[in-house]
Amino acid sequence: MHWKSSQSPRKKKARMSKSEFKAMMIVFFDIRGVIYIDWVPEGQTVNQVYYKNVLTTLRERVRRRRPDMWKNVSWILHHDNAPEHNALSVKRYLAKNNIPVMEHPPYSPDLAPCDFFLFPKIKSALKGTRFESMDAVKAKATQLLNSLTQDDLQHCFQQWKIRMERCRDREGGTTLKGITFRLSDFFQ
C-alpha cells in the first residue's frame, strides 16, 4: 500500500484531446436500413427552411428506395420535438405532401431510436479514433450506418416498441392524427 498526503500532487492521466472536427448529421432509417443521411454543413443552423429541404430529399429517397411503401403511402415519419420539426411551415409541408407523422412525447430522448440506439452505437464505434479530415469522419460514420444489419435494426425497433408501450402503459398514450393506436400495428 502506498500512502500519500493531501498535499501530494495528483497522479497524471493521459487524456485524449478533443477532436477538432464536429459533424452533425440527420439520419432517416427503417427496419430495412438507412434511407437518407444529410450531413449538415459546418456553421449551418438546422432551422425550418433547412429541415424542409431535408424532407424534400427524404421524400425522393423514399420514392426511390422504398417504392412499395411510397405507392401504398405506408411510411410514417417519426421525429422528435425539435423546434424546426414543429415549425408551422414544416407542419404545412408535411400535410400538403400527405406525410403522416408519429407524434413524439416532449422531452423524451429515451423514445427516439436515434438517441437510444443509432447515435450511441456510432459514437462508441468512433471513440478513440483519430481522423485526418471531416471527409474521413463522414466516410467512417456512413460506413458504420450502412453496415447495420437487419437484426440490429430489428432489435432497435423492438426496443422502441417496448419503450413506447411502457410510455403508453404509464398514461403517456400515443396518438396519430387524433386516433389512439396500438404500437404493434407498426411492428412486425
What are these regions (language model features)?
Residues M1-Q188:
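Surface/interface recognition patches
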